[in-house]
């Protein structure tokens, strides 16, 4: 049996959808409030998306299109991939990594779940 701390009690397909949604929201809004476990799971994926944005090749755009949700963002009516490549990636052009930070915040009132604020640096 797996370690209970590593089992998230959901299937892989569900987690893939949640991660895609959270990463897309993080890139569009700059920060999101979620549970600590989810924040830890999406940190590496968000940083990979920003690294793809820094490459700015056709192949990297296609990889980002494959992962990010294609929803119109609330920022200048651009979709999330275009916003990633045109606005977010140039900010981090000279940064080698560490594009996100996780800040632990007060536990959620209803079920006392550990909460965190994940934001772009």
Curated annotation (Swiss-Prot):
GO terms for molecular function: structural constituent of ribosome. The keyword Cell membrane does not apply. InterPro entries: Ribosomal_bL17 (IPR000456), Ribosomal_bL17_CS (IPR047859), Ribosomal_bL17_sf (IPR036373). SUPFAM superfamilies: Prokaryotic ribosomal protein L17 (SSF64263). GO terms for cellular component: cytosolic large ribosomal subunit. Keywords: Ribonucleoprotein, Ribosomal protein. Part of the 50S ribosomal subunit. Contacts protein L32. NCBIfam families: L17 (TIGR00059). This is Large ribosomal subunit protein bL17. It comes from Metamycoplasma arthritidis (strain 158L3-1) (Mycoplasma arthritidis). The gene is rplQ.
């Amino acid at each position: 049996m797996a370690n209970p701390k590593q089992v998230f009690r959901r299937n892989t397909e569900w987690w893939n959808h949640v991660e895609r949604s959270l990463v897309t929201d993080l890139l569009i809004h700059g920060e999101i409030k979620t549970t600590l476990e989810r924040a830890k799971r999406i940190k590496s994926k968000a940083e990979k998306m920003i690294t793809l944005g820094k490459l700015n090749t056709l192949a990297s755009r296609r990889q980002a299109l494959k992962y990010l949700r294609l929803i119109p963002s609330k920022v200048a009516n651009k979709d999330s991939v275009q916003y990633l490549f045109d606005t977010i990636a140039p900010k981090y052009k000279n940064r080698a990594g560490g594009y996100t930070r996780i800040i632990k915040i007060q536990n959620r009132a209803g079920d006392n779940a550990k909460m965190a604020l994940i934001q772009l640096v």
